[in-house]
Swiss-Prot record:
It comes from Gorilla gorilla gorilla (Western lowland gorilla). This is Taste receptor type 1 member 3. Residues 592-603, 661-682, 751-762, 813-852 are cytoplasmic. It holds the Pfam family ANF_receptor. The lineage of its organism: Eukaryota, Metazoa, Chordata, Craniata, Vertebrata. It is a multi-pass membrane protein. Residues 1-20 form the signal peptide. The gene is TAS1R3. Putative taste receptor. TAS1R1/TAS1R3 responds to the umami taste stimulus (the taste of monosodium glutamate). TAS1R2/TAS1R3 recognizes diverse natural and synthetic sweeteners. TAS1R3 is essential for the recognition and response to the disaccharide trehalose. Sequence differences within and between species can significantly influence the selectivity and specificity of taste responses. It is found in: Cell membrane. Belongs to the G-protein coupled receptor 3 family. TAS1R subfamily.
Length: 852
């Protein structure tokens, strides 16, 4: 074992720029074990010319070094060594590893993949009818890092049901269990990352964006997923295009140039770039040379941390770069592990001992695995020591170890002896596996994905290299720290990327053209409202609700009816008090002077009955105000018509008596006068009221009024009123009263008055005129007034009718009783009666005898 002094000296030599002797890292990429794990890492990068000139099935030479690939390979080594040193996970067993370079190219990755599938102890893949007992060289594979490679290798491994755990392949298509039944990954799928990106656009109100993707499976599927996510959130993609890979021909490069030109000329200020590192590098290289105006770039995880993209000259002028990176546990011991490992690789004694051990291993048929790894210094890899995918590699190894622990049924004392585990047996324990890595508990879901948080990263330029700053987090929902974001705008204000302005409160969008984000703002009419800011149509309020113009909510309609406290009702109640007071006063006078000639000439008891009926008409007015009820609606018309019929029938008897006395021969007058007084008069009143009862009964049975709530009559209230179902039947209910009034008018209008006598006919004539004027005016007024005021109109008509009859017929008599009692004599009031006519008849007979 090497001493600390030797390690320190080796590490000091390793840190020197351009130092020294080659390392022996390339000899440390495989180690024997009871169970072998394969590893696929991008240790180098191939020259483009090697692909273009390839005419034979030989592998391209990977000459360029990839620091991240080497660090990920070292993370796998560290995880395997930790597991082998633990006594609780695989006690008594050792894991081995066989790590290969993919050069980030499918052509290169296929050779080690075939090697992994070769039969254990050989280099051959035999053809069998059944591979259940087939034991390949490795039990499981860690990697590769990209979706493009995983799409190729995944189908190889899936045929053999060999577990494959990728630490970077995020394409959603890899979640398809029917195509990739043995694929797992320790990174979330692209759908999660793209959902976070769509939430970010929605958070900042960017709904007019450009979406670009690399022209490969990764970019094409990413754009397809993003298009669906954006459409569901009301985000419009103004420009969409694919970025050709660097080795594409000039005609395909021209397409992305056209897209960038359109983006530069439009109002789009935000671009989603879901592309591989090389495609993003090519795009920005052209954008810088063509002086594309600064934008907000929403980056995919593939290029967000790429040194190749970050190091482009002029990249700082491209605008604001935001993107999401998977959050994992911090491997605090990893930087020291790398430093120690590189120090050992620089020590000749260690490398010599390692070379002797390598001689005991099988010859490496793929040649030297990473020759460029032997020519690096610590400075070459120091920038990626805390790369976020390092933990993903670490967790992938622990997932396989935990599944093997479960398969072997290991416990604290060891793992029971049994036949070697086959890959398909291990796969059964990988599904829905829960495992621990770096202090975190992780779990594969049914699609082989893990649920991990994302950090929202912002590029903050410090000199020529940007640093990644945390400005938010996504774990199913997005949380941003806006104050930490530094925008590329001169005033550090958030850029606006919208096709149309945000509609104001109470306005909805009327879409123009093909994009839902381009629209005019239209006001919501009364009775409708805007429910959500992105609505394209106004939502109608419910039947019991209302809203003003440009409203964002509906209000409950309150019930509207003729309330007791309304000014019109209060005025009518004052009028009612006046009318009822006059009726009671007149009734009191008539009762007090019931035996006087004036009262007897007015009908005596019938006159008092008529006044009582007028009082009942006044009281019936109280049925109209207030919230209507079914009983109230049914009682309004009968209880107001019947008392009026009783009053008019008594006046009809007065008119008939005056007509008989004045216009008919004395012989007829004597015969009819008895029918107009006494019991016969009451019979006439009863018959008139029975006719009215019959009409009212028919009205209530055939067309009963009902309480209805009208939701449309008033803009903000619900009108509750008694609805008349038939205006014809309503008019017929007035027929008895109208007929009695008309007969009264005819019986008194042309009657000759007698000199020196009280003109009873005149009072009746004016009373009937008041009746007709009131009810004739009532009809057009009722038809044109608001429905809510119709009860007030009928109240007013009844009270005016009562006051008209009082003023024309009863009050003059009351005046005579009070102010001129001397006229209250039989000669003044009863002279025109039948007795007087008989006296005049006798006088005429005597004069005839004298003449003879």
């Amino acid at each position: 074992m090497l001493g600390p002094a030797v390690l320190g000296l080796s590490l000091w030599a390793l840190l020197q720029p351009g130092a020294g002797a080659p390392l022996c890292l390339s000899q440390q990429l495989r180690m024997k074990g009871d169970y072998m794990l394969g590893g696929l890492f991008p240790l180098g990068e191939a020259e483009e010319a090697g692909f273009r000139s390839r005419t034979r099935p030989s592998s391209p030479v990977c000459t360029r070094f990839s620091s991240n690939g080497l660090l990920w390979a070292l993370a796998m080594k560290m995880a395997v060594e930790e597991i082998n040193n633990k006594s609780d996970l695989l006690p008594g067993l050792r894991l081995g590893y066989d790590l290969f370079d993919t050069c980030s190219e499918p052509v290169v990755a296929m050779k080690p993949s075939l090697m992994f599938l070769a039969k254990a102890g050989s280099r051959d893949i035999a053809a069998y009818c059944n591979y259940t007992q087939y034991q390949p060289r490795v039990l499981a594979v860690i990697g590769p890092h990209s979706s493009e490679l995983a799409m190729v290798t995944g189908k190889f491994f899936s045929f053999f049901l060999m577990p494959q755990v990728s630490y970077g392949a995020s394409m959603e298509l890899l979640s398809a269990r029917e195509t990739f039944p043995s694929f797992f990954r320790t990174v979330p799928s692209d759908r999660v990352q793209l959902t976070a990106a769509a939430e970010l656009l929605q958070e900042f109100g960017w709904n007019w964006v450009a979406a670009l993707g690399s022209d490969d499976e990764y970019g094409r599927q990413g754009l397809s997923i993003f298009s669906a996510l954006a459409a569901a959130r009301g985000i419009c993609i103004a420009h969409e295009g694919l970025v050709p890979l660097p080795r594409a021909d000039d005609s395909r490069l021209g397409k992305v140039q056209d897209v960038l030109h359109q983006v530069n000329q439009s109002s789009v200020q935000v671009v989603l770039l879901f592309a591989s590192v090389h495609a993003a590098h090519a795009l920005f290289n052209y954008s810088i040379s063509s002086r594309l105006s600064p934008k907000v770039w929403v980056a995919s995880e593939a290029w967000l941390t790429s040194d190749l993209v970050m190091g482009l000259p002029g990249m700082a002028q491209m605008g604001t770069v935001l993107g999401f990176l998977q959050r994992g546990a911090q491997l605090h011991e990893f930087p020291q592990y790398v430093k120690t490992h590189l120090a050992l690789a620089a020590d000749p004694a260690f490398c010599s001992a390692l070379g002797e051990r390598e001689q005991g291993l099988e010859e490496d048929v793929v040649g030297q695995r990473c020759p460029q790894c032997d020519c690096i210094t610590l400075q070459n890899v120091s920038a990626g020591l805390n790369h976020h995918q390092t933990f993903s590699v670490y967790a992938a190894v622990y997932s396989v170890a935990q599944a093997l622990h479960n398969t072997l049924q290991c416990n604290a004392s060891g793992c029971p002896a049994q036949d070697p585990v086959k890959p398909w047996q291990l796969l059964e324990n990988m599904y829905n596996l829960t495992f621990h890595a770096g202090g975190l508990m992780l779990r594969f879901d049914s699609s082989g994905n893990v649920d991990m948080e994302y950090d929202l990263k912002l590029w903050v330029w410090q000199g020529s290299v940007p640093r990644l700053h945390d400005v938010g987090r996504f774990n199913g929902s997005l949380r941003t720290e806006r104050l930490k974001i530094r925008w590329h705008t001169s005033d550090n204000q958030k850029p606006v990327s919208r096709c149309s302005r945000q509609c104001q409160e109470g306005q909805v969008r009327r879409v123009k053209g093909f994009h839902s984000c381009c629209y005019d703002c239209v006001d919501c009419e009364a009775g409708s409202y805007r429910q959500n800011p992105d609505d394209v149509t106004c939502t109608s309020c419910g039947q019991d609700e209302w809203s003003p113009e440009r409203s964002t909510r509906c209000f409950h309609r309150r019930s509207r009816f003729l309330a007791w406290g309304e000014p019109a009702v209060l005025l009518l109640l004052l009028l009612l008090s006046l009318a009822l007071g006059l009726v009671l006063a007149a009734l009191g006078l008539f009762v007090h002077h019931r035996d006087s000639p004036l009262v007897q000439a007015s009908g005596g008891p019938l006159a008092c009955f008529g006044l009582v009926c007028l009082g009942l008409v006044c009281l019936s007015v109280l049925l109209f105000p207030g919230q209507p009820s079914p009983a109230q609606c049914l009682a309004q018309q009968p209880l107001s018509h019947l008392p009026l019929t009783g009053c008019l029938s008594t006046l009809f008897l007065q008119a008939a008596e005056i007509f008989v006395e004045s216009e008919l021969p004395l012989s007829w007058a004597d015969r009819l006068s008895g029918c107009l007084r006494g019991p016969w008069a009451w019979l006439v009143v009863l018959l008139a009221m029975l006719v009215e009862v019959a009409l009212c009964t028919w009205y209530l049975v055939a067309f009963p009024p009902e309480v209805v709530t009208d939701w449309h009559m008033l803009p903000t209230e619900a009108l509750v009123h008694c609805r008349t179902r038939s205006w014809v039947s309503f008019g017929l209910a007035h027929a008895t009263n109208a007929t009695l009034a008309f007969l009264c008018f005819l019986g008194t209008f042309l009657v000759r008055s007698q000199p020196g006598r009280y003109n009873r006919a005149r009072g009746l004539t004016f009373a009937m005129l008041a009746y007709f004027i009131t009810w004739v005016s009532f009809v057009p007024l009722l038809a044109n007034v608001q429905v809510v005021l119709r009860p007030a109109v009928q109240m007013g008509a009844l009270l005016l009718c009562v006051l008209g009859i009082l003023a024309a017929f009863h009050l003059p008599r009351c005046y005579l009783l009070i102010r001129q009692p001397g006229l209250n004599t039989p000669e003044f009031f009863l002279g025109g009666g039948p007795g007087d006519a008989q006296g005049r008849n006798d006088g005429d007979t005597g004069n005839q005898g004298k003449h003879e």
